[in-house]
């Protein structure tokens, strides 16, 4: 994969995981909640992607999905699409609902490769099992990981180093997939009353390749205007703390990344703006539509027309 696409994918999709999982509110943990929201992604003032988030949950179960497509210059340089989903149930940690993921799936495609990963969780031990598949878009044939362009270009030393960086099984136990992790983080924020006082949280994550923690803090509610619309928001500032599975450069890059998410300070608690900064980019993602109110805003054709 082209280096630009890999950087865009790492930064933008990582941020979108947060939006996908944090969208619904649980002011009342027993209240069923559904959301369908559309977002636009901007980097350097350029429109580079669109996303649609779906989530449905009640006191027993949750299902969440995310579809993202490259737009504008990003689409011209390297077409990219991703489709992610997570589902599971809930247990309780004190008075806070804690997600228990059952299945996490991540599909993506670029100009050369189509890839799919499915991660499942043992309901008793919570041990994860992962299956991955790569297909060449040119030939339609399945590829091994060693045949992937970005792996083939690595030196023997780099491949040996990657093999040693595999996350040990015991480090995966008790972790959440990225989408379930942000659901857990949002529950902690709401349970601790972020509208009244600052809240801190830390959630363990395994994404199928890397093990890290999401660490966040909130600030007091304030009024902001975004695209001529005024919101009363709570700010959640996040950092990612690497634990296992990283190269030296990858660990440094993750430590340097900073995220900020603005949530409406109401019962829905939905994100209206996300910003992310690292050594490669500074990007922003804005809420463009509530698809339950404006369904056409979330169709691929309408998003493509808006991008042109």
Predicted regions and their residues:
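Bacterial N-terminal signal peptides that target proteins for export
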Residues: 1-15
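Small/flexible residues
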Residues: 8-9, 38, 105, 135, ...
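Sec/Tat signal peptide C-region and signal peptidase I cleavage site
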Residues: 22-27
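Acidic, serine/threonine-rich low-complexity disordered tracts
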Residues: 28-125, 178-308
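Hydrophobic alpha-helical segments and helix pairs
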Residues: 100-157
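Surface-exposed beta-loop interaction hotspot
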Residues: 155-175
